Amino acid sequence: GYGGPNGSITARADLLEKYDLPFPTNAEELLDIGEELQQRVKDDLGETWYFWDHEMQVTPVYFFRTLDNWPFYVDYAEEIIYIDQEGNVEAYFETEEFRMAADFQRDMYVRGLRHPDILSIPRDLKTQANQSGRYLFGLGTGALSDYPLIVQQFPDAELEQFYLAEGKPFYETLPVWNSNSVPSTTDQPQAGIEFLNWLYASNENHDLFLYGVPGEHYEPVGDDRMTQVRTESGQAVDAHPFWQTQYVPFANFGTDALDALVDSYLTPMDNVENAINVGFVFDKEPVSAEWANVLAEREASMYPIKWGVVSYED
């Protein structure tokens, strides 16, 4: 599944085995093994592969896990606020943690393990790389859910998710992920509530909305598996993005889905520590204009440093 907030990394395990390379256990090994893997793939396929992340704005939780003071909180999608487990609040970009993350990314970029145009490449290029399995390691992406698409390109592909600093706790920063709500300012909020009530009232309603008509768009297989009718490109002919509305107890997975993917959704994680700020929601409305300006400045001034294009010292 989507394990970026937990710091997961996805590996082409078949290539690590083919080239007799180990799974990395720390940040330095991640770069060293990535560099070796990049050269081996280039020698074999004549292609240059890179590290890819899920989004430009997300924080490198996979790297944070390797730091001595882990766990700590940095907002996953906005990167403005840092909170340690004592409740101390700082501006993330002014912390030592950001400097170390920036230095790590700079090393990755200088060694050619990032796409040289990381700041400007279209998102669909990254999506294509991930869904075809053309990556050194997927950092919070390259998800197990892409496996049915990847094996169309590489029939012998094997995917495995792992974590640096194995044994350190996972960090729960949100009680709910990808939740749905109805804006109070909408003209007919009751209609939205009625739809959500219908959607989650039964497994049948849930499956109809997410997967289409049984027997026409998909065939149920057992309690939590299905086969979907797909296009030539491998996409389901009628399916709503599951991450937006799927309710885990009702979830279905393709018969070609990896068992590890199903387990990642249905099996609770062990060794989890809750962030001190879980449940607190910062109301940005009174400062919405200022907040928007901060986010715009973050992208203009901090992204080049964050992604290693410009060194922290410069």
Question: Which stretches of residues belong to each language-model region?
Answer:
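Extracytoplasmic/secretory soluble proteins
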Residues: 1-314
